[in-house]
Amino acid sequence: MKALSPVRGCYEAVCCLSERSLAIARGRGKSPSAEEPLSLLDDMNHCYSRLRELVPGVPRGTQLSQVEILQRVIDYILDLQVVLAEPAPGPPDGPHLPIQTAELTPELVISKDKRSFCH
């Protein structure tokens, strides 16, 4: 059996500690699992602010809770569904009358002499 040198054992321990301290320094002292909820919270806050911007009728200067924002989003979606469910308006029922020459301004009326230049 080989005897382990106590100096070598300490060196390995120091290397291990220095690797951990580098990892902590790179991560600013937070483990990746601790950073995840904060980034998710930022994402959710961004989503709520984006929803607030997209829904019409939300006053800009007032504070709304997340529940109020979601309720306004739901109301807006329901309003859109009602509008889309309505039948589309058709063309007017009356006959389409062509524009008479008398209804045009004199600048728009081309005399018969000038019409020959067009064709």
Curated annotation (Swiss-Prot):
Keywords: Biological rhythms, Myogenesis, Nucleus, Phosphoprotein, Repressor, Transcription, Transcription regulation. GO terms for biological process: cellular response to leptomycin B; central nervous system development; circadian rhythm; epithelial cell differentiation; heart development; metanephros development; muscle organ development; negative regulation of cell differentiation. GO terms for cellular component: cytoplasm; nucleus. GO terms for molecular function: bHLH transcription factor binding; leptomycin B binding; protein dimerization activity; protein domain specific binding; transcription corepressor activity; transcription regulator inhibitor activity. CDD domains: bHLH_dnHLH_ID3 (cd19693). Residues 28-80 form the bHLH domain. Its main location: nucleus. Transcriptional regulator (lacking a basic DNA binding domain) which negatively regulates the basic helix-loop-helix (bHLH) transcription factors by forming heterodimers and inhibiting their DNA binding and transcriptional activity. Implicated in regulating a variety of cellular processes, including cellular growth, senescence, differentiation, apoptosis, angiogenesis, and neoplastic transformation. Involved in myogenesis by inhibiting skeletal muscle and cardiac myocyte differentiation and promoting muscle precursor cells proliferation. Homodimer, and heterodimer with other HLH proteins. Interacts with COPS5 and COPS7A. Interacts with IFI204. Interacts with GATA4 and NKX2-5. Interacts with ANKRD2; both proteins cooperate in myoblast differentiation. Interacts with CLOCK and BMAL1. This is DNA-binding protein inhibitor ID-3.
